[in-house]
């Protein structure tokens, strides 16, 4: 078994420059933090198709902010057997703010850029998972941790020494909130 490979995709500046991470194994892939805006999600779909031919099995969300899950719809539509997940405490944060955010964000970015009904993740109750074909490379959920919210999940790939960190680490810019 080859080690898991990780790739990143940066969204547009309009989409708050959020980073989406794709982890690809021998027989399956998983995506972390789908983007905020529909055009960015459509770009992610094309990027995944260019990057790998293995099926996308799941999409995970690091925390409850909309720029990390709002436009999962086009991605899940492209891979209809894929599921959207988050740690239970992340799902609780999404539930707490969902109705308000669904009304607010289209007023700023336009209804053409924000899904009318963003899909909500289902709670992932486990501390790790494995991709088919790469059972020797677990992906471990760490959290809740403090990122730019108090309910952040990091995803640790110990064999590959990779961390998917969402908004717990910043590089070239400061987050808007």
What spans do the regions from the language model cover?
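Short Pro/Gly-enriched beta-strand edge/turn motifs at strand-loop
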Residues: 1-9, 109-114, 134-139
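Core dinuclear metal-dependent hydrolase active-site scaffold
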Residues: 22, 127-158
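Short Gly/Pro-enriched turn/cap motifs at secondary-structure boundaries
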Residues: 11-13, 117-120, 143-146
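Active-site environment of divalent metal-dependent phosphoester hydrolases
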Residues: 17, 37-39, 64-69, 91-94, ...
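Conserved beta-strand hairpin/beta-sheet module of binuclear metal-dependent hydrolase folds
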Residues: 2-50, 154-167
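Signal/transit-peptide handling
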Residues: 163-177
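Short catalytic-loop micro-motif centered on adjacent basic/acidic residues
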Residues: 30-33, 57-61, 140-141
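Active-site HxH/HxHxD metal-binding segment of metal-dependent hydrolases
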Residues: 46-130
């Amino acid at each position: 078994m080859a080690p898991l490979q990780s790739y990143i995709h940066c969204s547009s500046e309009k989409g708050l420059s959020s980073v989406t991470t794709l982890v690809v194994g021998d027989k399956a892939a998983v995506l972390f933090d789908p983007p905020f805006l529909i055009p960015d999600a459509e770009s992610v779909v094309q990027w995944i198709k260019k990057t790998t031919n293995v099926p996308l099995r799941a999409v995970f969300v690091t925390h409850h902010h909309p720029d990390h899950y709002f436009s999962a719809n086009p991605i899940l539509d492209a891979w209809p057997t894929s599921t959207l997940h988050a740690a239970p405490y992340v799902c609780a944060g999404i539930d707490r703010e969902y109705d308000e955010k669904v009304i607010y964000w289209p007023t700023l970015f336009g209804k053409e850029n924000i899904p009318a009904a963003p899909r909500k993740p289902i709670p992932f109750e486990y501390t790790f998972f494995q991709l088919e074909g790469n059972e020797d490379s677990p992906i471990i959920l760490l959290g809740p941790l403090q990122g730019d919210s108090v309910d952040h999940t990091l995803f640790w790939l110990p064999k590959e020494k990779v961390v998917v960190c969402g908004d717990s680490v910043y590089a070239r810019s400061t987050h808007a909130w």
